[in-house]
């Protein structure tokens, strides 16, 4: 049956900001859906509040709304655009929940919109625990013994039946938010209280514990004629008890017998039929008891998921694209497989002749005080995928692609340590982010495979693989470099050992191993991901490396090529914004006739889609892997400035190896990053900087600090996302920093800067081609200096800065660009205090604000800069004037503190946000209000506000209090703040701080008395004292600000209506022309 003709226009719901549990895999699926449906001639309307996505580019849909994914806003869009259908399966849990809400509120019925891809009933049947259990029993499949509770009493009754340990999961939350494992009644009550609060339906599912069972997933696609295919089976390396998003996973499943696989395959198809998914992809999760083979269905997601992005990249089968076409009425046999160039239909089940491993990436070091043990609640922020011909090869490639300082199974503990075994046992039993390395340490320390199995419940087959690698490592260490003959080295390379790891084991430099391989002429070959195990020829160049005989890379020799290095796995500080830039570089250079080559290892992103570039190498972004690809492809230029710190770190070494790095030279990048060299440039240009010093010892720091004056910003040199960066207020604080946060030495200097308190911070993005400088945008931060720029909301155009100040910055940016010989993108950060402009830092690379500026101004900066790097001037491109839009755009960030109870949610110089949203309005207030709604803020228009501010904010707080009163708020204040307000004739109710007696602030927050809290602090002691206010505000969902500027922005936003007017990106950009 060909496509439906009764629908002409389709609304696609996006996933919104990136949060833990819902990352850029939904940009990948949404972008594919837009392409697939427009190919078929439908008018596509898209809503997504996240500006850092490819899917919100104006070319991707006919009407694109960067608006909050909130049912009232979406209703306005439906009313204006009148779509015939809505597709909710491409935007994760956010889109499903929004679609169900639109259905519940009667919006779909009111405007005659049909839901395609999944029916409201199928979504509800899969997501509602009780209905799901009944459905599974009906088809003869078991689910875990469980019960449902809506109150604490009901929960305790269920626990009595299920027993401890038990697993608690709230309904309709994502990434296991609010769930956990309870081993006793006390833990049980704590987890249930949190879960009831987080579940939108106030519903908990309490399950018997399946801890230690094996976990599997099936990616299934079904069409309306009941054609069903399994795209991929996935096995979790980690046993049940760890969220699948935090588990190492392997595809295809490795430890199932064929009979077990067939049973699971049939069961997963039966699940889709029973739930009623008949147009698209779903993921079904199973648990198997290794003791007796009992099979249980855990859950199913009736939508495209994180696993389906992985399955798509692992097999080359584009699940999201196929699902979008099935949603409009096609069947699988009518669709052709792109990768084989249409030689096979989409109803062919993919078969693969390689092994894929995914390892999650964690960021616990950003959250002091967080519980870093892995549970049923997802905590990872990104993932890496690797492809190899064996389990060992793909696992070792994934370890080095993860970029956590490991080149393979580097040891975590020294075996001389008397506590070594105790530590290893603890890490194996109670898994943290590094367990995989501790497993190797366990074998080094003499544990047997059975010993490790008893502690981890990881299948012995996987453990034997790791044990063998450890034994090989011991042999390399024993024979040294002289013992590495051609056969032995080939055997090691086939098992995935990195040159760098072998060098460490043999006690030589990495370059010597590379030289040895050159002598033996030992290089990897490249195989293709082709969905059909090489049965048919493929036109698509999607490659992975391995050490075998036949190379399938087949590089062209007649075209000029440019290679883009991607950013590797997502992490805080280096996320989707950098992937966005890489994709734009590839698209722009393709349009200009270059052959583009992408190198990356992140399965969630658009950059690793096989049709984003001409050739895709799915490889770790390390020196060894990149040099081997350069050797075979011989590109004219390589772009390292777009993928964040990952490729930048390789710039010098690549250049030294003769690789043509284009754009700003590695030397110029170093001049901006190296403190002393940068200082010389600044002095030559006579620009102002805050007083600063570079120190290499503690006593030296104490001396310099006296000259500069406190407070200080301290940080190690060369970091992204503000790692180990703090504000210190006095000498004792400075000494504490050196003892706990960093080790300082001649090789690792620490930078001290005078901290400009209360300054306004400004970000400027620009492009330089050597002849002229184009200002992309000037963004004024809402939080004052001292909050990491990646965690601060910002406005474009600036909302308080004078024209003169902005012109001073424009001139300074231009001078810096020429001085540093920038070719391509650059980002400059300034601070403005008492009408003076201070230069904070310069980054001659793509910054995380590039996508936001591009959406706000309509100038695709990353594309323009990529063309500049390839030698096309700004004048030739006709892009020479700065665009200042006639409307305001505000970027707001999304923070993951709800996943890390116990962490202080105070914003500071260390970046901790995972994602961003954008709001657009005619006034700053309207734009800010929309950004707040988009970031799921709990802002209320009135009620009771609590004010507790530091000494330096007391003058300005009076004005803020007056604004809140005018808005209809009642006011409470702590002692010091109340005195200042009283003197100004405002009489708030006085409240006790926690140590002043009860009822105190925390009691009042718990009782739900406040709708808004503003709490600003300075000094270590005050920060510690007031931490309980911020934690409680977060826990009880009270909107709070930790800076006075944030408070003023909030007060302005209270007057605006965020749901009143919607505007598409296309309409915005038309106003600029």
Swiss-Prot record:
Binding of Mg(2+) 4, residues: 841, 843
Disulfide bonds, paired cysteine numbers: none
Cellular compartments per GO CC: carbamoyl-phosphate synthase complex; cytoplasm; cytosol
GO BP, sorted A to Z: 'de novo' UMP biosynthetic process; amino acid biosynthetic process; glutamine metabolic process; L-arginine biosynthetic process; pyrimidine nucleobase biosynthetic process
Sequence segments annotated as region (Oligomerization domain): 404-553
Domain of life: Bacteria
The keyword Aminoacyl-tRNA synthetase is annotated on this UniProt entry: no
Reactions accelerated catalytically: hydrogencarbonate + L-glutamine + 2 ATP + H2O = carbamoyl phosphate + L-glutamate + 2 ADP + phosphate + 2 H(+)
Chain positions recorded as Mn(2+) 2 binding sites: 299, 301
Pfam families: CPSase_L_D2, CPSase_L_D3, MGS
Region (Carboxyphosphate synthetic domain): 2-403
UniProt cross-references to SUPFAM superfamilies, sorted A to Z: Carbamoyl phosphate synthetase, large subunit connection domain (SSF48108), Glutathione synthetase ATP-binding domain-like (SSF56059), Methylglyoxal synthase-like (SSF52335), PreATP-grasp domain (SSF52440)
Signal sequence extent: none
Region of interest (Carbamoyl phosphate synthetic domain), residue spans: 554-936
Pathway where this protein functions: Amino-acid biosynthesis; L-arginine biosynthesis; carbamoyl phosphate from bicarbonate: step 1/1; Pyrimidine metabolism; UMP biosynthesis via de novo pathway; (S)-dihydroorotate from bicarbonate: step 1/3
MF GO annotations: amino acid binding; ATP binding; carbamoyl-phosphate synthase (ammonia) activity; carbamoyl-phosphate synthase (glutamine-hydrolyzing) activity; metal ion binding; nucleotide binding
Residues involved in Mn(2+) 3 binding: 829, 841
HAMAP family: CPSase_L_chain_A, CPSase_L_chain_B
Family per record: Belongs to the CarB family.
Entry note about domains: The large subunit is composed of 2 ATP-grasp domains that are involved in binding the 2 ATP molecules needed for carbamoyl phosphate synthesis. The N-terminal ATP-grasp domain (referred to as the carboxyphosphate synthetic component) catalyzes the ATP-dependent phosphorylation of hydrogencarbonate to carboxyphosphate and the subsequent nucleophilic attack by ammonia to form a carbamate intermediate.
Subunit-structure text: Composed of two chains; the small (or glutamine) chain promotes the hydrolysis of glutamine to ammonia, which is used by the large (or ammonia) chain to synthesize carbamoyl phosphate. Tetramer of heterodimers (alpha,beta)4.
The name this protein goes by in its record: Carbamoyl phosphate synthase large chain
Organism this protein belongs to: Escherichia coli (strain K12)
């Amino acid at each position: 049956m060909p496509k439906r003709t009764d629908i002409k226009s389709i609304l696609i719901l996006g996933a919104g900001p990136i949060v833990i549990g819902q990352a850029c895999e939904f940009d990948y699926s949404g972008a594919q859906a837009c392409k697939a449906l427009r190919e078929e001639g439908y008018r596509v309307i898209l809503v997504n509040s996240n500006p850092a996505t490819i899917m919100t580019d104006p070319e991707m849909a006919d009407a694109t709304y960067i608006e909050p994914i909130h049912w009232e806003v979406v209703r306005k869009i439906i009313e204006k655009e009148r779509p015939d259908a809505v597709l909710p399966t491409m935007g994760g849990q956010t889109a499903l929940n929004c679609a169900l809400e639109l259905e519940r509120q009667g919006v779909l019925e009111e405007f005659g919109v049909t839901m395609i891809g999944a029916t409201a009933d199928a979504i509800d049947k899969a997501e509602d625990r009780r209905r799901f259990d009944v459905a599974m029993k009906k088809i003869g499949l078991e689910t875990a013994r469980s019960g449902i509770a809506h109150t604490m009493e009901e929960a305790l009754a269920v626990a009595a039946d299920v027993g401890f340990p038990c697993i608690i999961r709230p309904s309709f939350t994502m990434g296991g938010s609010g769930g956990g494992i309870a081993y006793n009644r006390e833990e049980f009550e704590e987890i249930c209280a949190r879960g009831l609060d987080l579940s939108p339906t106030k519903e908990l599912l309490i399950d018997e514990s399946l801890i230690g069972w094996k976990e599997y997933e099936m990616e299934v696609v079904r069409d309306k004629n009941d054609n069903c295919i399994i795209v991929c089976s996935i096995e979790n390396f980690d046993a049940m008890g760890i969220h699948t998003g935090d588990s190492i996973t392997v595809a295809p499943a490795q430890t199932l017998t064929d009979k077990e696989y067939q049973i699971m395959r049939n069961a997963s198809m039966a699940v889709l039929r029973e739930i009623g998914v008949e147009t698209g992809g779903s993921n079904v999760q199973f648990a198997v008891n290794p003791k007796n083979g009992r099979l249980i269905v855990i859950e199913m997601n009736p939508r495209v998921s994180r696993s389906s992005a992985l399955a798509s990249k692992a097999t080359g089968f584009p699940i999201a694209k196929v699902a979008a076409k099935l949603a409009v009425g096609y069947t699988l046999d009518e669709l052709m497989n792109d990768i084989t160039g249409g030689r096979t239909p989409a109803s062919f089940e993919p078969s693969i002749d390689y092994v894929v491993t995914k390892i999650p990436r964690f960021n616990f070091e950003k959250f002091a005080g967080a519980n870093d043990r892995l549970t049923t609640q997802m905590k990872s922020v990104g993932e890496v995928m690797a492809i190899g011909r064996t389990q060992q090869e793909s696992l070792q490639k994934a370890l080095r692609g993860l970029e956590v300082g490991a080149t393979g199974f580097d040891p975590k503990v020294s075996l001389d340590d008397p506590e070594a075994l105790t530590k290893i046992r603890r890490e194996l039993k109670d898994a943290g982010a590094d367990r995989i390395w501790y497993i190797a340490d366990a074998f080094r320390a003499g544990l047997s495979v059975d010993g490790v199995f008893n502690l981890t419940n990881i299948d012995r087959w996987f453990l034997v693989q790791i044990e063998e690698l450890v034994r090989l490592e011991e042999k390399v260490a024993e024979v040294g470099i002289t013992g590495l003959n051609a056969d032995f080295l080939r055997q090691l390379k086939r098992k995935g050992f990195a040159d760098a790891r072998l060098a460490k084991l043999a006690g030589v430099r990495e370059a010597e191993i590379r030289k040895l391989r050159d002598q033996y002429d030992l290089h990897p070959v490249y195989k293709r991901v082709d969905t059909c195990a090489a049965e048919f020829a493929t036109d698509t160049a999607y490659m992975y490396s391995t050490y075998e005989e036949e190379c399938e890379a087949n590089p062209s020799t007649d075209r000029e090529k440019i290679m883009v290095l991607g950013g590797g796995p997502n992490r805080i500080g280096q996320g989707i914004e950098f992937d966005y830039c890489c994709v734009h570089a590839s698209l722009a250079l393709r349009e200009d006739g270059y052959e583009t080559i992408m190198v990356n290892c992140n399965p969630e992103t658009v950059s690793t889609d096989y049709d984003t570039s001409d050739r895709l190498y799915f490889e770790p972004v390390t020196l060894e892997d990149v040099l081997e690809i350069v050797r075979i492809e011989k590109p004219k230029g390589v772009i390292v400035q777009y993928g964040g710190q990952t490729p930048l770190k390789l710039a010098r070494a690549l250049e030294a190896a003769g690789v043509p790095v284009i754009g700003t030279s590695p030397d110029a990048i170093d001049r901006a990053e190296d403190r002393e060299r940068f200082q010389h440039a600044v002095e030559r240009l006579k620009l102002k900087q805050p007083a600063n010093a570079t120190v290499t010892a503690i006593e030296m720091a104490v001396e310099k600090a006296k000259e500069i004056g406190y407070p200080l910003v301290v940080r190690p040199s060369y970091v992204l996302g503000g790692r180990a960066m703090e504000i210190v207020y006095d000498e004792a604080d400075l000494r504490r920093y050196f003892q706990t946060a960093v080790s300082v030495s001649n090789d690792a200097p620490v930078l001290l800067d005078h901290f400009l308190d209360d300054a306004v911070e400004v970000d400027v993005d620009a492009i330089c081609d050597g002849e002229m400088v184009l200002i992309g945008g000037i963004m004024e931060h809402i939080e004052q200096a001292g909050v990491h720029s990646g965690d601060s909301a910002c406005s474009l155009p600036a909302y308080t800065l004078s024209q003169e100040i902005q012109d001073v910055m424009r001139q300074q940016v231009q001078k810096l660009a020429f001085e540093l010989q920038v070719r391509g993108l650059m980002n400059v950060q300034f601070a403005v205090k008492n009408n003076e402009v201070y230069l904070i830092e310069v980054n001659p690379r793509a910054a995380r604000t590039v996508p936001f500026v591009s959406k706000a101004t309509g100038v695709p900066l990353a594309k323009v800069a990529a063309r500049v790097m390839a030698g096309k001037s700004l004048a030739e491109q006709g892009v020479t004037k700065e665009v200042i839009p006639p409307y305001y755009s505000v970027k707001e960030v999304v923070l993951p503190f709800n996943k890390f109870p116990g962490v202080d949610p105070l914003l500071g110089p260390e970046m901790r946000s995972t994602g961003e949203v954008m709001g657009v309005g005619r006034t700053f207030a309207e734009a800010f209000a929309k950004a707040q709604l988009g970031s799921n803020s709990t802002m209320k228009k009135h009620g009771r506000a609590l004010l507790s501010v530091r000494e330096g904010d007391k003058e300005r707080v009076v004005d803020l209090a007056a604004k809140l009163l005018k808005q209809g708020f009642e006011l409470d204040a702590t002692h010091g703040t109340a005195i200042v307000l009283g003197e100004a004739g405002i009489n708030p109710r006085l409240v006790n701080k926690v140590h002043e007696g009860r009822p105190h602030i925390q009691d009042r927050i718990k009782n739900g008395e406040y709708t808004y809290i503003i709490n600003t602090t300075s000094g270590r002691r005050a920060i510690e004292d007031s931490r309980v206010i911020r934690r409680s505000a977060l826990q009880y969902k009270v909107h709070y600000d930790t800076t006075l500027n944030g408070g003023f922005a909030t007060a302005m936003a209270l007057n605006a209506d965020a749901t009143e007017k919607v505007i598409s990106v296309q309409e915005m950009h038309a106003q600029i022309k």
